[in-house]
Amino acid sequence: MENRMNELVSLLNQYAKEYYTQDNPTVSDSQYDQLYRELVELEKQHPENILPNSPTHRVGGLVLEGFEKYQHEYPLYSLQDAFSKEELIAFDKRVKAEFPTAAYMAELKIDGLSVSLTYVNGVLQVGATRGDGNIGENITENLKRVHDIPLHLDQSLDITVRGECYLPKESFEAINIEKRANGEQEFANPRNAAAGTLRQLNTGIVAKRKLATFLYQEASPTQKETQDDVLKELESYGFSVNHHRLISSSMEKIWDFIQTIEKDRVSLPYDIDGIVIKVNSLAMQEELGFTVKAPRWAIAYKFPAEEKEAEILSVDWTVGRTGVVTPTANLTPVQLAGTTVSRATLHNVDYIAEKDIRIGDTVVVYKAGDIIPAVLNVVMSKRNQQEVMLIPKLCPSCGSELVHFEGEVALRCINPLCPNQIKERLAHFASRDAMNITGFGPSLVEKLFDAHLIADVADIYRLSIENLLTLDGIKEKSATKIYHAIQSSKENSAEKLLFGLGIRHVGSKASRLLLEEFGNLRQLSQASQESIASIDGLGGVIAKSLHTFFEKEEVDKLLEELTSYNVNFNYLGKRVSTDAQLSGLTVVLTGKLEKMTRNEAKEKLQNLGAKVTGSVSKKTDLIVAGSDAGSKLTKAQDLGITIQDEDWLLNL
């Protein structure tokens, strides 16, 4: 019986791959169903022999209560975007300055959802969403229902891989036909449908919707030398990889590839929104490293956005958490990139003046980055005697006089007690990338603020269940959940708190770098501008902004209040002792290492307290140079930086 079960699992997985991945089935649906029913029956009789890669694991039936947060072992970075050939040429120049012979891998940018898959001993252990790059959601049960994701690898590997989960166009059309027949609201586009499906709590619905994946990265350390090798290895493990790709050292040839794909993309069975260009050599990738936000060795070219004409009916002016006043146009509704658009940003007053935008104008609307609707320009041939737009002199929230600082493009309200600014700051503090207080969205903030229950972020921690129950629409169950979410947020690692404070220029990635360095929010608040500016990837602008923020008396009072409510100020991620051998030193790895991998060398340096960066500068303390070291070694010699070899590192 056990042999027959093994045989059936092998056959059914092969037939499923032919059907879902290769679009080339070799057996009929009825033949597949017959074998599948046989396996189900055998598994009922012999549950002790059920294999981890059995296709029966993909069948629905589970109704999940929710999704738990998942800390990624290997962070998922965003990519720098490019919208023109000139930006790609500039990227090429930056790379070639370090590596004149660098070749690139150009791959399709699938319009889906990034997922991370972790296998332990070859068995799928965790499938998670990207989230903010550091913390995603555990959606393992849903990803088990995606038919081209292997539940079990042929080898007993411990590996984490990355890819894009998407909905093929054919599956998208079938879902919307069914929704139409049932009188339900249709999905706007395949990406929204894929996102909605992966958020389903009923795994049976996920199993029916025929999601698919393309894998593109091994996040865990690999012995492979190039991105091309990685893709071939992923395919050998049974993952789906995309074969529309090109390797070339010529950006002109990459551009020709982009133009060809853009012209033909409508014929692809899935949506794409651009081309990702990566340095093909993994060793070069390591040397180039990362900025605070993105890898220096990759760029995402985005196809030109779809454009439509619409009429501006009116303009709303709103003030954000930093006091910037943003104009938003109300439009005649148009269909754009799969959604109905009736509002679009006008950016700022300088943009309105530059484009001479007026109410009543017919304008060209597009989605910036395929996400945010924006006005591109005015169709002057359709203008009729519209008057120049009146720019507000007073804040739309508090009535204070607005200012337009020299060198800035935006109007700004500088009243610290402006109600809308306060509400926006409170909502930001509770948002997912900050303190992540579930249920504490803008509408709740509005109710609490209007009821005079909160006026600053410390007030959030004064709230009781009884306070929440005084609000319209809040029942005991909701109030209890929100209260517990507030209490749980006290235990967040301090970089979440720092980002939540909404300091100008200090994003989530910079917050993490700062807390990794200083370990504690109080220590950071007392740090000098020079010590902050010396952190690789940050600089003087962030240092000055932090110094200005922390020297305010009201900020010191706020930190005291947060301390009294037991809000955690410590960084909970991995840090190295200040007594470590290389503590505080900035080190660059360059050249080919013979006795250890680059990842092993990097990990050893970090464990010894060093900060490993990708570029040589005056801030670099030493470099470890292997064979064939290039421009980085030359630059280090010119700057008089200490140079060590691989043996020196091995002997530490």
UniProtKB/Swiss-Prot annotation:
Keyword Transmembrane: no
Domain BRCT, chain residue ranges per copy: 577-652
GO cellular component: cytosol
Pfam family, one: Nlig-Ia
MF GO annotations: DNA binding; DNA ligase (NAD+) activity; metal ion binding
Active-site residues (renumbered): K109
Listed PROSITE patterns: BRCT, DNA_LIGASE_N1, DNA_LIGASE_N2
Binding site for NAD(+): D29, S30, Q31, Y32, D33, S78, L79, E107, R130, E164, K278, K302
InterPro entries: BRCT_dom, BRCT_dom_sf, DisA/LigA_HHH, DNA_ligase, DNA_ligase_AS, DNA_ligase_CS, DNAligase_adenylation, DNAligase_N
GO BP terms in the entry: DNA repair; DNA replication
Cofactor(s) it depends on: Mg(2+); Mn(2+)
Keyword annotations from UniProtKB, A to Z: DNA damage, DNA repair, DNA replication, Ligase, Magnesium, Manganese, Metal-binding, NAD, Zinc
Enzyme Commission number(s) from the entry: 6.5.1.2
SUPFAM superfamilies given in the database record: BRCT domain (SSF52113), DNA ligase/mRNA capping enzyme, catalytic domain (SSF56091), Nucleic acid-binding proteins (SSF50249), RuvA domain 2-like (SSF47781)
Binding site for Zn(2+): C395, C398, C413, C418
Known catalytic reactions: NAD(+) + (deoxyribonucleotide)n-3'-hydroxyl + 5'-phospho-(deoxyribonucleotide)m = (deoxyribonucleotide)n+m + AMP + beta-nicotinamide D-nucleotide
Keyword NAD: yes
PANTHER family the UniProt entry points to: CHROMOSOME TRANSMISSION FIDELITY FACTOR 18, DNA LIGASE
Primary role: DNA ligase that catalyzes the formation of phosphodiester linkages between 5'-phosphoryl and 3'-hydroxyl groups in double-stranded DNA using NAD as a coenzyme and as the energy source for the reaction. It is essential for DNA replication and repair of damaged DNA.
Family per similarity comment: Belongs to the NAD-dependent DNA ligase family. LigA subfamily.
NCBIfam families associated with the record: dnlj, PRK07956.1
Designated name of the protein: DNA ligase
Annotated organism of origin: Streptococcus agalactiae serotype Ia (strain ATCC 27591 / A909 / CDC SS700)
Organism lineage: Bacteria, Bacillati, Bacillota, Bacilli, Lactobacillales
